């Protein structure tokens, strides 16, 4: 009953929310906002839905978020597999105002599989964050592609199953190649909406591609001396970055950052730390897992921090390159010890 009331409230908000003046481009998560703001600079504003300090893995929409979706000039999201909190609102706005990255034909060949083989499912997860709620709803949506489809969700432990069941690594903002495609798509959409700013948008796109190429070259050189050093990350978010810049990830603690690994998994990780001479364990600012502190204490391995959302990076024209550089610096700070 509560679920039905929540869905009704969201639907009502979508139907009744007033159109706002000076609507912006809305990105589901901040790293997408870095790409968007680089292209939209001087054209229109950029907003991010998931606020600083929050994680898209467990985010719940507020009514004000629904209004932002409805009033935006353009919404950029990854897709319902990872941005599931946006599925309903996205289905109720015009598809020409939406970029669904998962649906972009040029992106699909570049997607990587989630590295489930590095996470050992032993059935003993530590459910400190337990989510028991059911979804049983149908919806039609038609966003950024030419067909409608209908699907039904009826499952428990949504965050756990939804993220751990994914076969694709959807942290696509860490792929420079995919980010270039997204930037081009944003430029195309903004040019259609703001034809008088066509030249500025084209220049922003050119600057984005040039800056990204220059920054990538610097990062590759910076990380060359630590490319053979093994490390564990808190959750499997960095595969695209590691592949792009030649880093050697030994493994990760969990697929879903809301679910801590169990005792058997931790015992196996400890063995791998010793066997592979792992140099670093990386935590994340959005989560403070005690398992990393415990392993570091018992193994004497270094501990660093990676921020897959880029909370400390400010949106702006060069923010995507700054975000990648910030990640590289965080790697170096620990791996170079």
UniProtKB/Swiss-Prot annotation:
Keyword Signal on entry: yes
Disulfide pairings: 280-334
Ranges of Basic and acidic residues composition bias in the record: 119-129
InterPro entries: Bact_metal-bind_prot9 (IPR050492), ZnuA (IPR035520), ZnuA-like (IPR006127)
Keyword tags: Disulfide bond, Ion transport, Metal-binding, Periplasm, Signal, Transport, Zinc, Zinc transport
A single cellular component GO annotation: periplasmic space
Positions with a binding annotation for Zn(2+): 57, 171, 235, 307
Family: Belongs to the bacterial solute-binding protein 9 family.
Task performed by this protein: Part of the ATP-binding cassette (ABC) transport system ZnuABC involved in zinc import. Binds zinc with high affinity and specificity and delivers it to the membrane permease for translocation into the cytoplasm.
Name of this chain's protein: High-affinity zinc uptake system protein ZnuA
Natural source organism: Haemophilus influenzae (strain ATCC 51907 / DSM 11121 / KW20 / Rd)
Gene name of the record: znuA
